[in-house]
């Protein structure tokens, strides 16, 4: 079939297999150009391995460090009538590239929150890897089923205390308008912590430890975004912020429970980037469009793969890791410089519908959004018929 983007609100409901493959290849090429990682991990488990920062982590570990990688994800396969999800095509492309490069790589498709998928991962590690020395936790999900009680929790994106009315870039209408987000109640906060906090990360590490598949001196990191004043009302001082704070609690718990292995656990603070998750968050499309304008003008903007390659080389495996005042590995320091934030604020205050293209890089934002789904990739002929069915090799049933 000929595949063109179908956009509904802030999501794209289809994906292009060839475009996704090219996008993955671009990231692989970037990592290779940076040279080999020093002190690289050997056996890596990536929980949330198919898109965004998780995919970039898998690519960096494999093609920057020669690591064996086991990827966990929850994606949809294509059929003859309907495309698969971008993450499915990304993983198919990653697996093909890993095979070509002679890199060990296996894949598990299913609910990472479940006990069943944890057990599958453990069985695979025992059979093929022995132990893992890096565990990346990069899940973004709107809901979670508690594996022990069966209760389903849904996350919300709401401020805490008072409702917030703020400027917003309505991406479907291409307009600047105002959005009011109602304040969260305690259930909203608790449920969001359940879905997006550190409990499942902790459960993964506990399960891996009990199964004796964690290497001595292993490292694990979960990813977070910690913005400044502009994004605080919806992101920091909000339900999602409380969930991210719970990652700090989990970090301490993981360090304590794995102290006999000298385990290292970190939360890594990363750039605001265009992902399927961030495009759903009110204010983020406008904030990122302004951020693009400022940081691209300075030549300092880093996308997903640039951030992760630098996180690995400078922080996770670097000689002098950089920490923020909260003790997180601090990779988005360029974004949070006062000068950058002041210029973003100036754009924010001034921009209206008529000046979107002049004052922000919304075009860049929109292009980056399309690229997530394999569209707008240079060198891909979108008039060509393509097969939406793309099998993933080395999938564990």
From Swiss-Prot:
Signal peptide extent: none
Active site annotation, chain numbering: 235 (proton donor)
InterPro entries: Eno_Rdtase_FAD-bd_dom, Enoyl-CoA_Rdtase_cat_dom, FabV-like_NADH_b, Trans-2-enoyl-CoA_reductase
GO annotation terms (biological process): fatty acid biosynthetic process
Annotated site (Plays an important role in discriminating NADH against NADPH): 75
UniProt entry tagged with the keyword Lipid metabolism: yes
Residues involved in NAD(+) binding: 48-53, 74-75, 111-112, 139-140, 244, 273-275
Enzyme Commission code: 1.3.1.9
Catalytic activity as recorded in UniProt: a 2,3-saturated acyl-[ACP] + NAD(+) = a (2E)-enoyl-[ACP] + NADH + H(+)
One example GO MF annotation: trans-2-enoyl-CoA reductase (NADH) activity
Summary of subunit composition and partner proteins: Monomer.
Protein name: Enoyl-[acyl-carrier-protein] reductase [NADH]
Native organism: Pseudoalteromonas translucida (strain TAC 125)
